Amino acid sequence: MIIMALHILRRGKMTSKFVQKINSVEWLLTDGATGTNLFDMGLMSGDAPELWNEKYPEKIAKLHKDTVDAGSDIFLTNSFGSNALRLKLHNFGNKAFKLSKISAEIARDIADYSDRTVFVAGSVGP
């Protein structure tokens, strides 16, 4: 899906920093294995990773920082399941907006901390 989006953007006339970047390089490195890494950090199977945005923001920040330090040009927010239906399963359906906002703020802080241009993409699940 990301490759398709990059192909479409390369053909366009947009001038955003992101489009300028993808037009100037052959490839961009993205993050991966977010769930696996969160399990390694203590997330339990069945838990909602999005709740960690508020409960353990330092762990989410470390996850993103490690991704950037490893060379990622783009990384996703910790918000894939941050919607009312998914969070309702954990009795936090009313916190979807707040948790999504926190995930974006944590990610943006880490991207801005980098000494190079790093892009943050919102992760939106079903």
Predicted regions and their residues:
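Domain-level signal for soluble alpha/beta catalytic cores
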Residues: 3-126
